[in-house]
Amino acid sequence: MAFGAGGGGGRRPFFRRRKTCPFSGPNAPKIDYKDVKLLSRYVSERGKIVPSRITAVSAKKQRELAQAIKRARFLGFLPYVIR
């Protein structure tokens, strides 16, 4: 008997499930420039804003998040650069 001859024991292809936006939904947190703990989760260890393809934030919420991070930096709640 030949291997792989339609025996039904083949592997299924791997599909990565699309992550949902953490800011959409009924009990999702509100993006606020004063919430430093929330904003710091979306800033890298070097101080850069993490892209939405990594954090799975929707495009609209990513724009709001970026604006809140920039506002928090301007007011001194978040640093511009982390050394």
From Swiss-Prot:
Query: Tell me, what's a Pfam family for it?
Result: Ribosomal_S18
Q: Do you know which PROSITE patterns this protein is assigned to?
A: RIBOSOMAL_S18
What top-level branch of life does the organism fall under? Bacteria
BP GO terms, sorted: translation
Q: Which GO terms describe its molecular function?
A: small ribosomal subunit rRNA binding; structural constituent of ribosome
Q: GO terms for CC?
A: cytosolic small ribosomal subunit
HAMAP family of this UniProt entry?
Answer: Ribosomal_bS18
Function description: Binds as a heterodimer with protein bS6 to the central domain of the 16S rRNA, where it helps stabilize the platform of the 30S subunit.
The record's family statement is: Belongs to the bacterial ribosomal protein bS18 family.
According to the record's subunit comment, the protein's assembly and interactions are: Part of the 30S ribosomal subunit. Forms a tight heterodimer with protein bS6.
- UniProt name for this protein: Small ribosomal subunit protein bS18
